[in-house]
């Protein structure tokens, strides 16, 4: 279900405070665990280090990202490909 328009986008208070403190001109990376926060127009041009459960993934915010969640740009799972059929590998040799 979508979020109510009257509530507005969710942004963690501590993340918003960090953005206001840094300013738009800062090149400093802002570390965050808040994957659930929505990207607002204030974040454009800033770089965030979003935690994926293991490490921090750098995310540079552009105009196209506004309205999406931080976690969408820091994948949590590593895909190694589907397992190959062992029988077909043995026949080829």
From Swiss-Prot:
GO molecular function: rRNA binding; structural constituent of ribosome
Disulfide bond positions: none
Gene3D superfamilies named in the record: 30s Ribosomal Protein S19, Chain A
Gene Ontology CC: one annotated term: small ribosomal subunit
Signal peptide: none
Keyword annotations of the record: Ribonucleoprotein, Ribosomal protein, RNA-binding, rRNA-binding
GO BP: any one term: ribosomal small subunit assembly
SUPFAM superfamilies per the UniProt record, alphabetical: Ribosomal protein S19
Main function: Protein S19 forms a complex with S13 that binds strongly to the 16S ribosomal RNA.
Family the entry assigns: Belongs to the universal ribosomal protein uS19 family.
Protein name per Swiss-Prot or TrEMBL: Small ribosomal subunit protein uS19
